[in-house]
């Protein structure tokens, strides 16, 4: 079976309908029965439009980079990608083939 991993690069402050984008993406993926999703919080990062930002022990309201990742079959990923693109706007989305060796229902 062919599997795909999608990574969506966003920031902590990004919103979807006034709610945190990363949580809304995970909720949408869960409702669409995607095998699994994860949000990774960076300790530092930059983009073409913003300088390097990094975390410190005193930062409470920082705007650090986040990566939302999910993995499932090509068919299931293709089904949710239009909504992911709508929610992510112009943010970077990467799709890559993966070989799932172990874990949940993806391995037969």
Give the location of each predicted region:
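Positively charged, small/polar-rich N-terminal and surface patches that mediate targeting and assembly
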Residues: 1-108
């Amino acid at each position: 079976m062919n599997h795909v991993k999608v990574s969506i690069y966003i920031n902590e402050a990004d919103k979807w309908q006034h709610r945190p984008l990363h949580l809304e993406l995970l909720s949408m993926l869960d409702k669409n029965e995607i095998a699994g999703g994860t949000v990774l919080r960076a300790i530092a990062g930059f983009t073409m439009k913003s300088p390097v930002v990094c975390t410190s022990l005193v930062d409470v309201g920082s705007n650090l980079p986040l990566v939302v990742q999910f993995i499932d079959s090509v068919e299931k990923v293709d089904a949710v990608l239009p909504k992911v693109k709508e929610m992510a706007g112009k943010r970077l989305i990467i799709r890559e083939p993966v070989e799932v060796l172990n874990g949940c229902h993806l391995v037969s």
